[in-house]
Amino acid sequence: MAQYPGFVYGSNEQQSPWADCERTVNWYPEPTQSSASPHVASLYPCPGQEEYVTVADINGRALFAMADRCFAVMGEHVYKVLDTNAASIVTNGTVTNDPNPASIASNGDAGGELLIGSGTNAYLLTIATNTLSASIGALAGKCTMVGMIDGYFLSFDSAASKFYISALNNGASWDATQYAQRSIAP
């Protein structure tokens, strides 16, 4: 078998990739202690994930944390993940389950809401009551991803190259004239 000097060892990234661009990801080198060994080191995998909570649904699609709270979209349910290694399904409603990632945004303490984008639909979760709305009608089929800026929710529609803007600190109010669209390719 051909010898590859320096093939097994850790990262040695330099500022310039021309100098050295070795990078080891999720593995660590363990030097061989014996001087008689033909190998200088061995690569071993880094310790992986630890199970934090178990839920009935599969396909973790989004995870969002704010103000000592954590929410997750798993399959068609929205879960509130607790710091006691437990999770509970938000009391009512489901979201569209598709193979794509979901997205979650918050309008902070002023609005107390989470906007969840899942399967081209948008859903509003009122944090104080753990109430999940049905799909927001104005955004039905128009929500690829969600975001927030300065208290305004944003809904991105990749099919139409548009983004929609909610009312200030109110994810339930969407004016159909409040959108922007790219008009020409760069």
Residue ranges and their predicted role:
Residues G117-N121, I127, S158:
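Beta-hairpin (beta-strand-turn-beta-strand) motif
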Residues D98-A122:
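Elongated alpha-helical scaffolds
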